[in-house]
Amino acid sequence: MNVISHNVANVQTPGFKAQRLHSADLVASGGEGAGVVTLAIDHSLASGPIIETGQWSNIAINGTGYFAVQSPYDGKIYYTRNGSFHLDSHGFLVNDQGYRLLNTQGNPIPALDTSSYSSFRIDDQGHIWGIRPDGTTQDLGNDHQIGIATFSSESGLVSEGGTLYAPSAQSGPADIGQPGSGGRGLLISGFVEGSNVSIEEEMVGMVLAKAAYEANAKVITTADEMNKALIDIKT
C-alpha cells in the first residue's frame, strides 16, 4: 500500500516514474502458504504524456535519455526526466531544488545573459538561443547546448528520491551527448513530460491489496480459532 500511496501522491509530478513492487509467496515446509515477501521495488520506464506549459525553459525529452543536473552544494550529479527548469537569480538553468542543468560536456550550462537578451528559446537539439529586444536571435554556443545522458541499462538506475536517479553497476555510467545523436531523444521546449502513473491501475492495485490483506487477516483469525478449539478439546 505504501508504494501505491507514493505513486498516487505523485500523479501530477513532472517526470515521475511509477514504482512497482515485486513480491513472491512464501511456502512452508509442509506446503502451506507462509505469507508474502517483497523481492524488490523498481520503477516503470514507460514515458509519461507530453504536457504543454508555454514556458521556454520547460523541456521534454521526446525519446530516450535523461537530463543531467548537478547539486551546487556537494557537486553530485543526478539524472532525471523532469524538465521543469527555470532561471535562478544568477541566470543558471536549475530545477526546483536549485540543481544546475548540464551541457553536452557534462558541465553546468553557463549563466544566461538576461541584460542582453529579453528572452530565450531552445531548439530540438538543445541549443539555447538568445532573443534580443529587436527580435534578432543568437545561438549562445556549444557551452550552452543541453546534454542528454543515456545508460547501457537504464533499469539499473537507483532512485534518489522524487524524480532523481543515480547510476549503478547495473546501469553502467552515464554517456552524455547531444540530443538526437547516438539514439538520444530530441527536445521539445515549452513542454514537460508528465508522470507515468495510471490512476486506474493504482486504484485496481489498491483494491487487490485491500482484498489480500482482509483474506490474510481472515486466515489468521480462523487459525487462531482452530487452535483455541483444539486446546479446549484437550482440556
Label for each model-derived stretch:
Residues 1-106, 112-235:
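Amphipathic alpha-helical polymerization modules
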